[in-house]
Amino acid sequence: MNYCYECGHKLVMKELEHEGRIPFCTSCRQFRFPIFSTAISMVTLNPKRDKLLMIQQYGKPNNILVAGYVNKEESAEDALVREMQEEIGRKVLQYRFLKSEYFPKTNTLIFNFAVIIDSESLED
């Protein structure tokens, strides 16, 4: 990030206690921390935990995990419940956080969860 996302002024590096050198806008007089998207992905299991559900998205040939972006003012946990309902119409019975990972190509921090849904199959 080279320019302030509020005013467009060129940022300079400035020392911030306990943080190190952080981009700073001399016009707004504010530190500018990185901005990135936040998403969730889910390893989705049936109640018996012996089947893994993956989806096929928008005509792409490979199956993927159920995933989606976290909306503004939404928690990752609320997003996973919403995305599961939107993507496959199922309710989440349980979930457990697994790990997070940053993807530079899409500037996205993804929170990965294991999820148990309310059905043995999508046909129920």
What is each of the regions a protein language model found here?
Residues 14-15, 91-100:
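A short coil-to-beta-strand element that immediately follows conserved catalytic motifs
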Residues 17, 46, 69, 101-102:
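Structured beta->alpha junctions
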Residues 43-87:
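Conserved Nudix-box catalytic region and its N-terminal flanking loop in Nudix hydrolases
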Residues 93, 101-124:
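Active-site-adjacent beta-strand/loop module that shapes the phosphate/pyrophosphate-binding cleft
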